[in-house]
Amino acid sequence: MKRLWQHCHAATLRNGKYSIVEDAVLVTDGPLIHWIGPRAELPPGDYAERIDLGGAWLTPGLIDCHTHAVFGGNRSGEFEQRLEGVSYAEIATAGGGIASTVRATREASEEELLASARKRLDPLLRDGVTALEIKSGYGLDLASEAKMLRVIRRLGEQLPATVRSTCLAAHALPPEYAGRADDYIGHVCTTILPALAKEGLVDAVDAFCEHLAFSPAQVERVFIAARELGLPVKLHAEQLSSLHGSSLAARYQALSADHLEYMTEEDARAMGAAGTVAVLLPGAFYLLRETRLPPIDALRRHGVAMAVASDLNPGTSPALSLRLMLNMACTLFRLTPEEALAGVTLHAARALGLEASHGSLEAGKLADFVAWEIERPAELAYWLGGDLPKRVIRHAEEVYRG
């Protein structure tokens, strides 16, 4: 069934630019975009329905390409500790941080994890998100990682959004493997990943390359195991120190390397050559009160696509608004509003391997878009909060109206 969506303007995000169409018309056919362009150039046709968007601005549906939205408990107590001067690394060394969330997640039932995740994802979806990634990594044993990934699959079935699942079993060292990181990585590679892949629970594989997590050599073992299973990889890299994990990610044609505050010019060059997306996470930077900025100019010089994500997690970025991350990416990291919007649409789609179907308003792609009550696209990165979406459309069907 063809529908004609009219009386609007569009920022299509073709090629990562605004690519604005004034007085636009968008035609959908079933779940897909059939045509988009100026009203004056609309081809003749019959339409089952004509929808008046009342002068709204259209953008692609927003994509949150890095979240840890499934977890037990919360870490508001650690938030207080950090404000008193205790560092993230000190909290982790004392058994807090990821380890405390692992305990709570292992204890939670699948139904409890599902209910709590739905509650925290609802604000993101009402904010215009139509696709997102959710990582495991708070189970750190086969049963608990499988539990998390089953919840993620169920969220994909229940939510009006595309949900990609990423196995992050190499997130931290579980207590039962204390002092035996190599043994745990072996367990991840030979037992956890193959079992989860066999169950069809994994779309991609991630790891945390950092002094307080896993070394580049250990991460490479995970990447090799993922490659043998036919799974793409991504990496938490260069958040707290420089281990050149982003160069390692590029060597394995990773979908993305994320955080990147301590990446070097050499790392940026490698990522640009490999086509690996840089996922910027300003929420974690802000909450940890970091001072070292990702090298945005180096990423620009080497043509690295930059995505922006919420990093929704209980410890370092309890962020429930992707639009707030747009403002932070501009204000803290000095992205332009155009770069930031591309970062939560086309480049975020690339970071999830979804660019063929998501991320821009083009014929043949899914009709996932948002109608905003704004006067120009830069407002999406300008306003701090507020209910801007007028309508959220997924697969040409309205899923939210403001």
From Swiss-Prot:
InterPro entries named among the record's database cross-references: Amidohydro-rel (IPR006680), HutI (IPR005920), Metal-dep_hydrolase_composite (IPR011059), Metal_Hydrolase (IPR032466)
Classification via Pfam families: Amidohydro_1
Pathway: Amino-acid degradation; L-histidine degradation into L-glutamate; N-formimidoyl-L-glutamate from L-histidine: step 3/3
EC number: 3.5.2.7
Enzyme class: hydrolase
Subcellular locations according to the entry: Cytoplasm
Record-stated family: Belongs to the metallo-dependent hydrolases superfamily. HutI family.
Keywords linked to the UniProt accession: Cytoplasm, Histidine metabolism, Hydrolase, Iron, Metal-binding, Zinc
Taxonomy, superkingdom: Bacteria
Sites where the protein binds Zn(2+): H66, H68, H236, D311
GO cellular component: cytoplasm
Names of the cofactor(s): Zn(2+); Fe(3+)
An annotated Gene Ontology molecular function: imidazolonepropionase activity
Organism lineage: Bacteria, Pseudomonadati, Pseudomonadota, Gammaproteobacteria, Pseudomonadales
KW Transcription (keyword) present: no
Protein name as catalogued: Imidazolonepropionase
Binding site for 4-imidazolone-5-propanoate: R75, Y138, H171, Q239, T316
Residues where Fe(3+) binds: H66, H68, H236, D311
Predominant place of localization: cytoplasm
GO BP field: L-histidine catabolic process to glutamate and formamide; L-histidine catabolic process to glutamate and formate
Its biological purpose: Catalyzes the hydrolytic cleavage of the carbon-nitrogen bond in imidazolone-5-propanoate to yield N-formimidoyl-L-glutamate. It is the third step in the universal histidine degradation pathway.
Cofactor binding description: Binds 1 zinc or iron ion per subunit.
